[in-house]
Amino acid sequence: MVDQITVQTIGVLVAASSVLIGVVYYILQMKEQNKNRQAQLFMQIYNHYLDRISDDEMDVFPMKYNGYDDFMEKYGWDTNPDGWRKFSRFLSYTEGMGTLVKRGLIDASLVYDINGGLVKWYWEKAKPFWVEFGVRHGVTHVAPFTEYLYERLMPMYEAEMSGG
């Protein structure tokens, strides 16, 4: 026969196991909700910029310049306000995405999957200009979050290009 202490012990173990299972389930649900929130936040921002960035891309992509002075002559805020606005809007977008990735609000792989190529293309095209812009205007680091984002996405890009 099973004594009363054994029955009570089994009851306590079952209750404790139930609580533990409930806590684990809750933690897993919270992680899933966090991923969903990240995706939702990213898509809200992406959708806000989608039309503008898509239109701007058609004008910014063919921009050609040799150094800071040449850029300012062709696309500067005084000579070509529309070109300047479009070029700068890309920086605002990549700075925003980089900030969210750095703060852990959005996973870098999510940004990469949706527009990693755009970030790579823009930063490689724009970095020399923005570095010189910072030098000439006394700003030590003009686009820290864009550069951070670029550095986070490049290993993913390289892995994809090498078939990894």
Regions found by a protein language model. Name each.
Residues 2-5, 16:
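Structural motif
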